[in-house]
Amino acid sequence: MSETGTGAAVADEAALVAGLRARRPDAFETMVRVYTPRLLAVARRLVGNDEDARDVVQDAMLSAYRSIDKFEAHSRVSTWLHRIVVNAGLMKLRTRRRKPEE
């Protein structure tokens, strides 16, 4: 799956979303493989370390999978996932602020 904006990429995204909605494990694996590198970079910039970034992306991927039926395709899957990662990262930062470092 590419993110070039071509017709093929749009068709790939539509197929991915259809697979996720059908709860096919291969579709989830594809989503993780294709989008994790970029999302990890976003999460690292937001939370500041690799361990928390991996947690954020994992939480975001599971959240996206569980709520794929809410995806309306007004934007690209990558945009939707980016927003979910940012929200998960902000939640991680809020949680971190509430807990003093031990």
Language-model regions: role of each:
Residues 69-73, 83-102:
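Arg/Lys-rich amphipathic alpha helix in sigma70-family domain 2
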Residues 3-5, 21-30, 40-59:
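Short, charged helix-capping/linker segments at alpha-helix termini
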Residues 31-35, 39, 85:
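Hydrophobic/aromatic residues within well-ordered alpha-helical segments
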